[in-house]
């Protein structure tokens, strides 16, 4: 869908809203991914209004759970996220937003919020011989 479908709206399109499965605070998790490299940059939360703003402005808006307010990524840091695509998962309880990220995505100054936390020890799984070649 293009932005023209949402111009001059003050509420989220009901056709989109009905597909969402919100948590008990009215939020949906949003995975933010760099559009060209597919690097996962961060996870934020959106309510219907943050989703509407994101769909209509071309910039990512989140709902801050700690500050209880809307924040548009990059307004204070300059590290803006320009929307390239917006998709719901099959259950409607998660969003994937592909963006063109300017600078760091993480509040720590790192490109990705997953750099700071680091890798955890994990047993690496392997496909069986029968599964090789399957997607």
From Swiss-Prot:
Its EC number is 3.5.4.19. Pathway: Amino-acid biosynthesis; L-histidine biosynthesis; L-histidine from 5-phospho-alpha-D-ribose 1-diphosphate: step 3/9. Mg(2+) binds at residues 89, 91, 93. Zn(2+) binds at residues 90, 106, 113. It is found in: Cytoplasm. Its cofactor is Mg(2+); Zn(2+). GO terms for molecular function: magnesium ion binding; phosphoribosyl-AMP cyclohydrolase activity; zinc ion binding. One of its GO terms (cellular component) is cytoplasm. Keywords: Amino-acid biosynthesis, Cytoplasm, Histidine biosynthesis, Hydrolase, Magnesium, Metal-binding, Zinc. PANTHER family: HISTIDINE BIOSYNTHESIS BIFUNCTIONAL PROTEIN (PTHR42945), PHOSPHORIBOSYL-AMP CYCLOHYDROLASE (PTHR42945:SF11). This is Phosphoribosyl-AMP cyclohydrolase. The lineage of its organism: Bacteria, Bacillati, Actinomycetota, Actinomycetes, Bifidobacteriales.
